[in-house]
A protein has these predicted regions:
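Conserved alpha-helical substructure of the radical SAM core
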Residues: 122-152
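Short linear Ser/Thr-Pro motifs
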Residues: 73, 107-108, 121, 191, ...
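Auxiliary Fe-S-binding modules of radical SAM enzymes
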Residues: 1-89, 243-251, 257-345
Length: 345
């Protein structure tokens, strides 16, 4: 069986190349062909002997993603790609252009098992995990089209990153590699629904990445409705895990809180959220819910959003309201889904 070498780091390439009788330095050349020069046909890797090129063709393959479609927001600050994997599965990835640089939102799974009622990505459940190479390839798809640098990565696309732990961690190290994308760990954010054991595990890795927790409620009663997986993890245990993460990494945790009219956006909800978090250093990101096709949930009026934020600010909680980006191309939070399927069925 041929080995897919896309997504292998230098050490893995060295093990493969040297183990098959070729000099170690050839692995570095192979890495550069893949990740720097973007040459994906072995016959074009002319630094190698014919013998090595023949061996690569016989024993290796490079599984690239195929770009099916792309969409761009009216302000040209958000671009979404629909990508096809080798097995025919579809994933979406989004690039957001900010004043400080380009940020990419990547998917970590095909579908999602978390069941959040406001999220389009979970409607058909989880199909499978993505490999580190498939996550990395989402970034290179943008580089191939636009040749743009990336300042930061958010793992906030389809899927729960912490239930694909090993591949996600491998991807993070690849993205950080100075010879690949050279993205600082501090500019990488993992968003999780709150898989408590994995938050502790991630904290113990001692990697200074940012952790964002999709809290969305001030108590278990509301959260169990919005985020069904939370029935396995009490909200106070999620916050305790976040506190451990902060103490271990010295990285402030972000709590994401989707605001939904008549559900979790009242004055009492804001006060209860403050009591839940206590004195823990954190950032609270308020996200007015985006309109979706499959469920009738609506954002509060702006005055209600501002009132909610003001309560948090008066309690000393650093709080912002997320800027909406890409809504008209279905690229905003909670709307990453495979619309392409609707057009071909």
């Amino acid at each position: 069986m041929k080995r897919n070498i896309w997504g292998l780091n230098l050490q893995e390439l060295e093990t493969w190349v040297v183990g098959n009788g070729f000099p170690r330095f050839r692995a570095k050349q192979l890495r550069d062909y893949l990740y720097k020069r973007h040459i994906f046909h072995f016959d074009e890797m002319t630094q190698f002997s014919q013998k090595m090129r023949d061996w690569l063709k016989e024993n290796g393959q490079i599984d690239k993603l195929v770009i099916i479609s792309r969409a761009q927001s009216d302000d040209e600050k958000t671009i979404k790609l629909l990508l096809k994997l080798k097995d025919g599965s579809l994933v979406e990835t989004v690039c957001m252009c900010h004043h400080y640089g380009n940020s990419i939102c990547v998917s970590t799974q095909v579908g999602c098992a978390m069941g959040c009622i406001f999220c389009a990505s979970t409607r058909k459940g989880l199909e499978r995990n993505l490999t580190a190479g498939e996550i990395l390839a989402q970034m290179y798809a943008f580089k191939e089209l636009y040749d743009i640098p990336f300042h930061s990565i958010v793992l906030m696309g389809a899927g729960e990153p912490l239930t694909n732990y090993e591949e996600v961690l491998h991807f993070i190290h690849l993205a950080n590699d100075p010879e690949l994308l050279n993205i600082s760990y501090r500019n990488i954010t993992i968003s999780t629904c709150g898989i408590v054991p994995q938050i502790y595990r991630l904290a113990d890795e001692n990697i200074p990445i940012t952790l964002a927790i999709s809290l969305h409620a001030p108590n278990d009663r509301i959260r169990n409705v919005l985020v069904p997986i939370s029935k396995n993890f009490r909200i106070k245990d999620v916050v305790s895990a976040a506190e451990y993460y902060f103490k271990k990494t010295k990285r402030r945790v972000t709590f994401e809180y989707i605001l939904i009219k008549d559900m979790n956006a009242s004055v009492e909800n804001a006060k209860e959220l403050c009591r839940l978090i206590g004195k823990m250093p954190c950032h609270i990101n308020l996200i007015p819910i985006n309109g979706t096709e499959h469920i009738k949930l609506y954002p509060p009026e702006w005055k209600e959003i501002k009132r909610f934020q003001d309560i948090l600010l008066k309690k000393g909680k650093e709080t912002t309201v997320r800027k909406q980006m890409g809504d008209e191309i279905q690229a905003a939070c909670g709307q990453l889904k495979r619309r392409y399927l609707n057009s071909v069925t």
